[in-house]
Amino acid sequence: MAKGMDIEIAPLDEDHVRAKITWSEQDVGGGKLVVEVTVKNPKTRPKADDQLRSDARALAVRFARAFADTIEN
């Protein structure tokens, strides 16, 4: 299993997109975490794909850190 993060963004309607974030680790036991998040993308100030990916990446990192903290405790 390759280590890294993949983000797929798909439109849901004119105001929302779905970000599917797949986080993979390559270590002893390895693992994969998949999170799907619906994000509001206002028509008045829509975000470019790069901005959406950046937001999704930041969210994935926060989620992974919180998840790791629960495992350690």
Protein language model features and the residues they cover:
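Acidic, low-complexity intrinsically disordered segments
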Residues: 2-6, 31-73
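Short, charged/polar N-terminal "headpieces" of proteins
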Residues: 1-26
